[in-house]
């Protein structure tokens, strides 16, 4: 079992229950899922790029990504409906907690010129989204085998009702928000 999950149950739940005066433990916000998305627009010209992106996302997440396809044709981007343009992974349960732990302890500190994550990236319902410019911050990616530096989007979906609750939840895990 992931250490952060134990920490959540033993410490964070009690802290947040006291802070927001919840009557039940079930009212305390929790992390529901973490979604990783990698858009590969260049996959239109070279199919190998999408395969490499899928391999990177598989190494980072530990599970096989779903290839996302264009929903509609856009002439300006030279894409047609159904073209593969990216990949995504939804992590839940044990894999989610393990990824979250690696994200906080290993990956985020390796971001170049890191000064903290923006606390304004909440969506109004307690969900947090962040972008990573380089996939090489994750230790699972071998720097020598990378053909191209790609970014990815990470969305942390919580059961929080407001941004304040969501931020308190992530801050309880020592999420590195900018001061």
UniProtKB/Swiss-Prot annotation:
The keyword RNA-binding applies. One of its GO terms (molecular function) is structural constituent of ribosome. Coiled coil: none annotated. GO terms for cellular component: ribonucleoprotein complex; ribosome. InterPro entries: Ribosomal_uL5 (IPR002132), Ribosomal_uL5_bac-type (IPR020930), Ribosomal_uL5_C (IPR031309), Ribosomal_uL5_CS (IPR020929), Ribosomal_uL5_dom_sf (IPR022803), Ribosomal_uL5_N (IPR031310). Pfam families: Ribosomal_L5, Ribosomal_L5_C. Keywords: Ribonucleoprotein, Ribosomal protein, RNA-binding, rRNA-binding, tRNA-binding. The keyword rRNA-binding applies. Signal peptide: none annotated. One of its GO terms (biological process) is translation. Belongs to the universal ribosomal protein uL5 family. Part of the 50S ribosomal subunit; part of the 5S rRNA/L5/L18/L25 subcomplex. Contacts the 5S rRNA and the P site tRNA. Forms a bridge to the 30S subunit in the 70S ribosome. This is one of the proteins that bind and probably mediate the attachment of the 5S RNA into the large ribosomal subunit, where it forms part of the central protuberance. In the 70S ribosome it contacts protein S13 of the 30S subunit (bridge B1b), connecting the 2 subunits; this bridge is implicated in subunit movement. Contacts the P site tRNA; the 5S rRNA and some of its associated proteins might help stabilize positioning of ribosome-bound tRNAs. This is Large ribosomal subunit protein uL5. The gene is rplE.
């Amino acid at each position: 079992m992931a250490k952060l999950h134990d920490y959540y149950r033993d410490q964070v739940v009690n802290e947040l229950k006291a802070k927001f005066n919840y009557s039940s433990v079930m009212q305390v916000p929790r992390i529901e899922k973490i979604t990783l998305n990698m858009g590969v627009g260049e996959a239109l010209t070279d199919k190998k790029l999408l395969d490499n992106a899928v391999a990177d996302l598989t190494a980072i997440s530990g599970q096989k990504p779903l290839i996302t396809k264009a929903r509609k044709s856009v002439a300006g981007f030279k894409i047609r409906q159904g073209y593969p343009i990216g990949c995504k992974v939804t992590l839940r349960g044990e894999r989610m907690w393990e990824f979250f732990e690696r994200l906080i302890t290993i990956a985020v500190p390796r971001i170049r010129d890191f000064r903290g994550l923006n606390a304004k990236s909440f969506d109004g319902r307690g969900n947090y989204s962040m972008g990573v410019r380089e996939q090489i911050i994750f230790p699972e990616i071998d720097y020598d085998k990378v053909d191209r530096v790609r970014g990815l989007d990470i969305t942390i979906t919580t059961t929080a009702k407001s941004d304040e609750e969501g931020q308190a939840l992530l801050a309880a895990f020592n999420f590195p928000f900018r001061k």
